[in-house]
Amino acid sequence: MAENFVVVDGGVVAPKGFKANGHKDRKYGAALIYSEADAVAAGVFTTNKVYAHPVALSKDTLVNNNVFRAIVANSGNANCFTKGGMEDAELLVKKAAELLKIPENQVLSASTGVIGRKMPMDIISLEVERAFENITMESSNENASKAIMTTDAFPKTVAVEFEVNGKSVRIGGIAKGAGMIAPNMLHATMLGFITTDIEISKEDLTNSLQKATDESFNNAVVDGDMSTNDTVYVLANAQSGVKYTDCKEEFDHALTYVSKELAKMIVSDGEGAKKLIEATVFGAETKEDAKKASMSIVRSLLLKTAVFGADPNWGRIAAAVGYSGAEMDMNNFDIIISDISSEKQAILVKAGEQIADCGTPELKLAEEIMKEDKIKIIVDLKMGSFENTAFGCDLGYDYVKINSEYTT
Protein backbone atom coordinates (compact mmCIF):
# COMPACT_ATOMS: atom_id res chain seq x y z
CA MET A 1 0.00 0.00 0.00
CA ALA A 2 1.06 3.63 -0.48
CA GLU A 3 2.68 5.39 2.46
CA ASN A 4 -0.10 6.83 4.62
CA PHE A 5 2.17 8.69 7.01
CA VAL A 6 4.89 11.31 7.25
CA VAL A 7 8.18 10.97 9.09
CA VAL A 8 8.49 13.31 12.08
CA ASP A 9 11.10 14.10 14.71
CA GLY A 10 11.04 12.96 18.31
CA GLY A 11 11.38 9.18 18.38
CA VAL A 12 9.69 7.75 21.48
CA VAL A 13 8.63 11.18 22.71
CA ALA A 14 6.86 12.09 19.46
CA PRO A 15 3.55 10.46 20.53
CA LYS A 16 1.44 12.43 23.02
CA GLY A 17 1.98 11.82 26.71
CA PHE A 18 5.42 10.21 26.62
CA LYS A 19 8.66 11.34 28.23
CA ALA A 20 12.12 9.81 27.95
CA ASN A 21 15.69 10.44 28.94
CA GLY A 22 18.86 8.61 29.82
CA HIS A 23 22.36 8.90 31.17
CA LYS A 24 25.58 7.07 30.39
CA ASP A 25 28.91 7.35 32.14
CA ARG A 26 31.50 5.57 30.01
CA LYS A 27 30.68 1.83 30.15
CA TYR A 28 27.32 1.81 31.93
CA GLY A 29 24.10 3.62 31.15
CA ALA A 30 20.37 3.65 31.81
CA ALA A 31 17.30 4.91 29.97
CA LEU A 32 13.74 5.60 31.09
CA ILE A 33 10.64 5.83 28.91
CA TYR A 34 7.55 7.02 30.77
CA SER A 35 3.88 7.40 29.88
CA GLU A 36 2.01 10.11 31.75
CA ALA A 37 -1.20 8.10 31.29
CA ASP A 38 -1.97 4.42 31.73
CA ALA A 39 -0.89 2.37 28.73
CA VAL A 40 -1.25 -1.13 27.38
CA ALA A 41 1.90 -2.98 26.37
CA ALA A 42 3.12 -5.77 24.14
CA GLY A 43 6.50 -7.43 23.90
CA VAL A 44 8.46 -9.96 21.88
CA PHE A 45 11.58 -11.67 23.16
CA THR A 46 14.53 -13.82 22.17
CA THR A 47 13.82 -17.51 21.61
CA ASN A 48 17.32 -18.40 22.80
CA LYS A 49 17.03 -21.11 25.49
CA VAL A 50 19.70 -19.23 27.43
CA TYR A 51 17.90 -15.99 28.24
CA ALA A 52 18.55 -13.05 30.52
CA HIS A 53 16.83 -12.41 33.85
CA PRO A 54 15.02 -9.24 32.67
CA VAL A 55 13.55 -11.29 29.81
CA ALA A 56 12.11 -13.82 32.27
CA LEU A 57 10.87 -11.09 34.60
CA SER A 58 9.21 -8.98 31.91
CA LYS A 59 7.56 -11.96 30.23
CA ASP A 60 5.84 -12.69 33.52
CA THR A 61 4.97 -9.03 34.07
CA LEU A 62 3.35 -8.76 30.64
CA VAL A 63 1.25 -11.88 31.14
CA ASN A 64 -0.04 -10.92 34.57
CA ASN A 65 -0.75 -7.20 34.15
CA ASN A 66 -2.80 -4.98 31.86
CA VAL A 67 -1.62 -1.48 32.81
CA PHE A 68 1.91 -0.20 32.17
CA ARG A 69 3.62 3.15 32.55
CA ALA A 70 7.35 2.76 31.94
CA ILE A 71 10.33 0.96 30.45
CA VAL A 72 13.73 0.94 32.16
CA ALA A 73 16.81 -0.34 30.38
CA ASN A 74 20.49 -0.55 31.25
CA SER A 75 23.58 -0.97 29.09
CA GLY A 76 26.97 -2.43 29.94
CA ASN A 77 25.73 -5.64 31.55
CA ALA A 78 23.33 -8.25 30.16
CA ASN A 79 22.28 -9.59 33.58
CA CYS A 80 22.33 -13.09 32.15
CA PHE A 81 23.64 -16.33 33.63
CA THR A 82 24.66 -14.82 36.95
CA LYS A 83 23.87 -15.69 40.56
CA GLY A 84 21.32 -13.29 42.00
CA GLY A 85 20.43 -12.04 38.53
CA MET A 86 16.69 -12.18 39.06
CA GLU A 87 17.01 -10.18 42.26
CA ASP A 88 19.05 -7.59 40.36
CA ALA A 89 16.41 -7.44 37.61
CA GLU A 90 13.76 -6.87 40.26
CA LEU A 91 15.89 -4.18 41.91
CA LEU A 92 16.24 -2.37 38.59
CA VAL A 93 12.46 -2.32 38.18
CA LYS A 94 11.95 -1.31 41.82
CA LYS A 95 14.36 1.60 41.45
CA ALA A 96 12.54 2.94 38.40
CA ALA A 97 9.12 2.48 40.02
CA GLU A 98 10.15 4.32 43.17
CA LEU A 99 11.54 7.26 41.23
CA LEU A 100 8.49 7.50 38.95
CA LYS A 101 6.08 6.83 41.83
CA ILE A 102 4.27 4.00 40.06
CA PRO A 103 3.69 0.31 40.95
CA GLU A 104 6.53 -2.08 40.12
CA ASN A 105 4.23 -4.25 37.99
CA GLN A 106 3.75 -1.30 35.62
CA VAL A 107 7.45 -1.26 34.66
CA LEU A 108 9.05 -3.37 31.92
CA SER A 109 12.82 -3.83 31.82
CA ALA A 110 15.66 -4.78 29.50
CA SER A 111 19.43 -5.13 29.74
CA THR A 112 22.28 -5.30 27.26
CA GLY A 113 26.00 -5.88 27.64
CA VAL A 114 28.39 -8.61 28.74
CA ILE A 115 26.92 -12.02 29.63
CA GLY A 116 27.94 -13.87 32.78
CA ARG A 117 29.05 -10.94 34.89
CA LYS A 118 27.33 -9.73 38.03
CA MET A 119 25.31 -6.54 37.64
CA PRO A 120 27.09 -3.63 39.37
CA MET A 121 23.83 -2.49 40.93
CA ASP A 122 25.37 0.47 42.72
CA ILE A 123 26.52 1.92 39.40
CA ILE A 124 23.37 0.95 37.47
CA SER A 125 21.11 2.40 40.19
CA LEU A 126 23.02 5.67 40.02
CA GLU A 127 22.57 5.77 36.24
CA VAL A 128 18.81 5.22 36.65
CA GLU A 129 18.70 8.09 39.15
CA ARG A 130 20.54 10.34 36.72
CA ALA A 131 18.18 9.34 33.91
CA PHE A 132 15.24 10.23 36.18
CA GLU A 133 16.79 13.58 37.11
CA ASN A 134 17.14 14.34 33.41
CA ILE A 135 13.57 13.31 32.61
CA THR A 136 12.21 15.70 35.25
CA MET A 137 13.99 18.60 33.56
CA GLU A 138 13.37 17.78 29.92
CA SER A 139 12.43 14.95 27.62
CA SER A 140 15.26 13.73 25.39
CA ASN A 141 14.77 10.92 22.92
CA GLU A 142 18.42 11.27 21.89
CA ASN A 143 19.74 10.82 25.44
CA ALA A 144 17.56 7.75 25.95
CA SER A 145 18.79 6.26 22.68
CA LYS A 146 22.45 6.93 23.46
CA ALA A 147 22.16 5.53 27.00
CA ILE A 148 21.40 2.00 25.75
CA MET A 149 24.25 1.86 23.22
CA THR A 150 27.10 -0.64 23.66
CA THR A 151 29.19 -1.25 20.52
CA ASP A 152 26.78 0.89 18.50
CA ALA A 153 28.32 3.64 16.40
CA PHE A 154 25.21 5.84 16.36
CA PRO A 155 21.79 6.16 18.07
CA LYS A 156 18.83 4.69 16.20
CA THR A 157 15.51 6.52 16.23
CA VAL A 158 12.47 7.12 14.01
CA ALA A 159 8.90 8.42 14.30
CA VAL A 160 5.89 8.75 12.00
CA GLU A 161 2.50 10.47 12.03
CA PHE A 162 -0.76 9.80 10.19
CA GLU A 163 -4.25 11.29 10.39
CA VAL A 164 -7.59 9.63 11.09
CA ASN A 165 -10.72 11.79 10.87
CA GLY A 166 -8.72 14.95 11.52
CA LYS A 167 -6.81 13.55 14.50
CA SER A 168 -3.11 12.68 14.49
CA VAL A 169 -1.66 9.33 15.53
CA ARG A 170 2.05 9.00 16.17
CA ILE A 171 4.39 6.03 16.50
CA GLY A 172 8.00 6.49 17.61
CA GLY A 173 10.87 4.20 18.40
CA ILE A 174 14.48 3.81 19.47
CA ALA A 175 16.72 0.78 19.16
CA LYS A 176 20.20 -0.48 19.87
CA GLY A 177 22.17 -3.25 18.31
CA ALA A 178 25.33 -3.81 16.31
CA GLY A 179 26.51 -7.36 17.02
CA MET A 180 24.83 -10.65 18.00
CA ILE A 181 21.99 -9.85 15.62
CA ALA A 182 19.93 -12.74 14.27
CA PRO A 183 16.73 -12.44 16.27
CA ASN A 184 13.83 -14.82 16.20
CA MET A 185 11.25 -13.32 18.51
CA LEU A 186 8.07 -15.31 18.51
CA HIS A 187 6.07 -14.00 21.42
CA ALA A 188 13.85 -10.35 19.12
CA THR A 189 22.14 -7.71 21.54
CA MET A 190 18.98 -6.08 19.92
CA LEU A 191 16.61 -3.88 21.88
CA GLY A 192 13.69 -1.93 20.43
CA PHE A 193 11.35 0.37 22.34
CA ILE A 194 8.29 1.79 20.57
CA THR A 195 5.62 4.20 21.79
CA THR A 196 2.29 5.20 20.29
CA ASP A 197 -0.65 7.33 21.35
CA ILE A 198 -3.33 5.17 19.70
CA GLU A 199 -6.14 3.55 21.70
CA ILE A 200 -5.77 -0.21 21.26
CA SER A 201 -6.41 -3.42 23.18
CA LYS A 202 -3.56 -5.49 24.56
CA GLU A 203 -4.52 -8.36 22.25
CA ASP A 204 -4.58 -6.20 19.12
CA LEU A 205 -1.29 -4.52 20.06
CA THR A 206 0.35 -7.91 20.58
CA ASN A 207 -0.85 -9.12 17.18
CA SER A 208 0.25 -5.92 15.45
CA LEU A 209 3.70 -6.07 17.03
CA GLN A 210 4.13 -9.71 16.07
CA LYS A 211 3.29 -8.97 12.43
CA ALA A 212 5.62 -5.97 12.37
CA THR A 213 8.43 -7.95 14.02
CA ASP A 214 8.14 -10.78 11.51
CA GLU A 215 8.62 -8.30 8.67
CA SER A 216 11.44 -6.34 10.29
CA PHE A 217 13.57 -7.38 13.27
CA ASN A 218 13.18 -11.09 12.49
CA ASN A 219 14.51 -10.40 8.98
CA ALA A 220 17.69 -8.70 10.24
CA VAL A 221 21.09 -10.41 10.34
CA VAL A 222 24.48 -8.97 11.27
CA ASP A 223 26.50 -11.99 12.34
CA GLY A 224 24.03 -14.86 12.72
CA ASP A 225 24.28 -14.96 16.53
CA MET A 226 21.05 -14.78 18.53
CA SER A 227 21.37 -12.77 21.73
CA THR A 228 20.15 -13.84 25.15
CA ASN A 229 18.53 -10.43 25.64
CA ASP A 230 16.69 -9.53 22.42
CA THR A 231 13.56 -7.58 23.31
CA VAL A 232 11.05 -5.28 21.63
CA TYR A 233 8.34 -3.43 23.57
CA VAL A 234 5.43 -1.23 22.50
CA LEU A 235 3.54 1.07 24.86
CA ALA A 236 0.20 2.54 23.72
CA ASN A 237 -1.44 5.21 25.91
CA ALA A 238 -4.59 6.21 23.93
CA GLN A 239 -3.79 9.96 24.15
CA SER A 240 -4.45 10.63 20.45
CA GLY A 241 -8.17 9.97 20.85
CA VAL A 242 -8.05 7.63 17.85
CA LYS A 243 -9.14 4.00 18.11
CA TYR A 244 -7.23 1.20 16.43
CA THR A 245 -10.51 -0.26 15.20
CA ASP A 246 -10.90 2.85 13.00
CA CYS A 247 -7.49 2.52 11.31
CA LYS A 248 -6.21 -1.05 11.56
CA GLU A 249 -4.51 -1.17 8.17
CA GLU A 250 -2.95 2.28 8.49
CA PHE A 251 -1.62 1.62 11.98
CA ASP A 252 -0.18 -1.80 11.16
CA HIS A 253 1.51 -0.40 8.06
CA ALA A 254 3.05 2.49 10.01
CA LEU A 255 4.19 0.22 12.85
CA THR A 256 5.84 -2.12 10.36
CA TYR A 257 7.59 0.86 8.73
CA VAL A 258 8.97 2.05 12.08
CA SER A 259 10.14 -1.47 12.90
CA LYS A 260 11.78 -1.93 9.49
CA GLU A 261 13.60 1.40 9.70
CA LEU A 262 14.97 0.51 13.14
CA ALA A 263 15.99 -2.94 11.87
CA LYS A 264 17.81 -1.41 8.88
CA MET A 265 19.63 1.04 11.16
CA ILE A 266 20.74 -1.88 13.32
CA VAL A 267 22.24 -3.86 10.44
CA SER A 268 23.76 -0.69 8.94
CA ASP A 269 25.55 -0.32 12.29
CA GLY A 270 26.78 -3.92 12.35
CA GLU A 271 30.12 -3.92 14.14
CA GLY A 272 32.57 -2.57 11.57
CA ALA A 273 29.90 -2.58 8.85
CA LYS A 274 30.11 -0.13 5.96
CA LYS A 275 27.26 -1.33 3.72
CA LEU A 276 23.58 -2.21 4.01
CA ILE A 277 22.33 -5.26 2.11
CA GLU A 278 18.66 -5.78 1.26
CA ALA A 279 17.84 -9.20 -0.17
CA THR A 280 14.40 -9.57 -1.72
CA VAL A 281 13.21 -12.96 -2.94
CA PHE A 282 10.17 -13.01 -5.23
CA GLY A 283 8.26 -15.86 -6.79
CA ALA A 284 8.65 -18.31 -3.93
CA GLU A 285 6.34 -21.28 -3.54
CA THR A 286 5.58 -20.31 0.09
CA LYS A 287 6.25 -17.39 2.43
CA GLU A 288 8.53 -19.70 4.41
CA ASP A 289 10.58 -20.42 1.27
CA ALA A 290 10.88 -16.70 0.52
CA LYS A 291 12.15 -16.09 4.04
CA LYS A 292 14.55 -19.04 3.96
CA ALA A 293 16.13 -17.86 0.73
CA SER A 294 16.37 -14.15 1.59
CA MET A 295 17.76 -14.84 5.07
CA SER A 296 20.26 -17.31 3.64
CA ILE A 297 21.63 -14.59 1.37
CA VAL A 298 22.19 -11.98 4.09
CA ARG A 299 23.50 -14.62 6.52
CA SER A 300 26.18 -15.93 4.10
CA LEU A 301 29.66 -14.99 5.32
CA LEU A 302 31.03 -15.42 1.80
CA LEU A 303 28.44 -13.01 0.42
CA LYS A 304 29.07 -10.53 3.25
CA THR A 305 32.80 -10.49 2.53
CA ALA A 306 32.15 -10.15 -1.20
CA VAL A 307 30.04 -7.06 -0.51
CA PHE A 308 32.80 -5.71 1.75
CA GLY A 309 35.27 -6.09 -1.11
CA ALA A 310 32.82 -4.78 -3.76
CA ASP A 311 33.14 -8.11 -5.59
CA PRO A 312 30.05 -8.99 -7.70
CA ASN A 313 30.52 -12.71 -7.09
CA TRP A 314 26.95 -13.71 -7.89
CA GLY A 315 27.80 -17.40 -7.52
CA ARG A 316 27.72 -16.87 -3.76
CA ILE A 317 24.15 -15.60 -4.03
CA ALA A 318 23.13 -18.61 -6.11
CA ALA A 319 24.80 -20.98 -3.65
CA ALA A 320 23.13 -19.35 -0.63
CA VAL A 321 19.70 -19.67 -2.23
CA GLY A 322 20.44 -23.24 -3.27
CA TYR A 323 21.28 -24.46 0.24
CA SER A 324 18.56 -22.41 1.96
CA GLY A 325 16.00 -25.19 1.76
CA ALA A 326 13.66 -23.18 -0.45
CA GLU A 327 12.12 -24.91 -3.45
CA MET A 328 13.78 -23.76 -6.68
CA ASP A 329 14.71 -24.78 -10.21
CA MET A 330 18.35 -23.97 -10.95
CA ASN A 331 17.47 -23.77 -14.65
CA ASN A 332 14.84 -21.08 -14.17
CA PHE A 333 15.58 -18.25 -11.72
CA ASP A 334 16.89 -14.67 -11.88
CA ILE A 335 19.54 -12.77 -9.92
CA ILE A 336 19.71 -8.97 -10.07
CA ILE A 337 21.88 -6.52 -8.12
CA SER A 338 20.72 -2.92 -7.77
CA ASP A 339 21.74 0.29 -6.06
CA ILE A 340 19.01 1.28 -3.59
CA SER A 341 19.82 4.99 -3.94
CA SER A 342 19.90 5.34 -7.74
CA GLU A 343 17.93 2.24 -8.74
CA LYS A 344 20.63 1.15 -11.20
CA GLN A 345 20.24 -2.58 -11.94
CA ALA A 346 22.57 -5.26 -13.22
CA ILE A 347 21.02 -8.53 -14.41
CA LEU A 348 23.43 -11.32 -13.47
CA VAL A 349 21.35 -14.43 -14.13
CA LYS A 350 18.19 -14.62 -16.27
CA ALA A 351 15.99 -17.73 -16.38
CA GLY A 352 18.88 -19.82 -15.12
CA GLU A 353 21.29 -18.47 -17.76
CA GLN A 354 24.44 -16.53 -16.85
CA ILE A 355 24.27 -12.98 -18.19
CA ALA A 356 27.16 -11.33 -16.34
CA ASP A 357 30.50 -12.76 -17.42
CA CYS A 358 34.03 -11.41 -17.65
CA GLY A 359 34.09 -8.37 -19.91
CA THR A 360 30.31 -7.98 -20.23
CA PRO A 361 28.58 -4.63 -19.60
CA GLU A 362 26.41 -6.32 -16.96
CA LEU A 363 29.41 -7.37 -14.87
CA LYS A 364 30.98 -3.92 -15.18
CA LEU A 365 27.73 -2.32 -13.99
CA ALA A 366 27.53 -4.82 -11.12
CA GLU A 367 31.06 -3.86 -10.07
CA GLU A 368 30.03 -0.19 -9.93
CA ILE A 369 26.90 -0.97 -7.91
CA MET A 370 28.85 -3.07 -5.41
CA LYS A 371 30.89 0.02 -4.50
CA GLU A 372 27.78 1.77 -3.17
CA ASP A 373 26.88 1.72 0.54
CA LYS A 374 23.31 0.45 0.01
CA ILE A 375 22.92 -2.64 -2.15
CA LYS A 376 19.81 -4.60 -3.07
CA ILE A 377 19.94 -8.22 -4.19
CA ILE A 378 16.84 -9.46 -6.02
CA VAL A 379 16.12 -13.12 -6.70
CA ASP A 380 13.07 -14.36 -8.61
CA LEU A 381 12.52 -18.08 -7.98
CA LYS A 382 9.61 -18.31 -10.47
CA MET A 383 7.94 -20.96 -8.31
CA GLY A 384 4.95 -19.06 -6.89
CA SER A 385 3.72 -15.69 -5.65
CA PHE A 386 5.35 -15.21 -2.23
CA GLU A 387 8.11 -12.76 -1.36
CA ASN A 388 10.26 -11.62 1.57
CA THR A 389 12.93 -9.00 2.20
CA ALA A 390 15.79 -9.59 4.63
CA PHE A 391 18.34 -7.05 5.85
CA GLY A 392 22.05 -7.57 6.42
CA CYS A 393 25.45 -5.92 6.20
CA ASP A 394 28.95 -6.56 4.97
CA LEU A 395 31.62 -8.17 7.14
CA GLY A 396 35.07 -6.64 7.42
CA TYR A 397 38.22 -6.50 9.51
CA ASP A 398 36.73 -4.31 12.24
CA TYR A 399 34.14 -6.95 13.20
CA VAL A 400 36.91 -9.33 14.25
CA LYS A 401 38.79 -6.57 16.08
CA ILE A 402 35.73 -5.33 18.02
CA ASN A 403 34.59 -8.77 19.09
CA SER A 404 38.03 -10.14 19.93
CA GLU A 405 38.45 -7.28 22.42
CA TYR A 406 34.85 -7.06 23.74
CA THR A 407 35.43 -8.06 27.38
CA THR A 408 38.92 -6.61 27.61
From Swiss-Prot:
Pfam families: ArgJ
Enzymatic reactions: N(2)-acetyl-L-ornithine + L-glutamate = N-acetyl-L-glutamate + L-ornithine
Active site: T189
Pathway: Amino-acid biosynthesis; L-arginine biosynthesis; L-ornithine and N-acetyl-L-glutamate from L-glutamate and N(2)-acetyl-L-ornithine (cyclic): step 1/1
Binding-site positions, substrate: T150, K176, T189, E271, N403, T408
Enzyme class: transferase
Any one of the GO CC terms: cytoplasm
Swiss-Prot/TrEMBL site (Involved in the stabilization of negative charge on the oxyanion by the formation of the oxyanion hole) positions: T112, G113
Disulfides per UniProt: none
The protein's role, per its UniProt record: Catalyzes the transfer of the acetyl group from N(2)-acetylornithine to glutamate, forming N-acetylglutamate and L-ornithine.
Name of the featured protein: Glutamate N-acetyltransferase
Lineage of source species: Archaea, Methanobacteriati, Methanobacteriota, Methanomada group, Methanococci
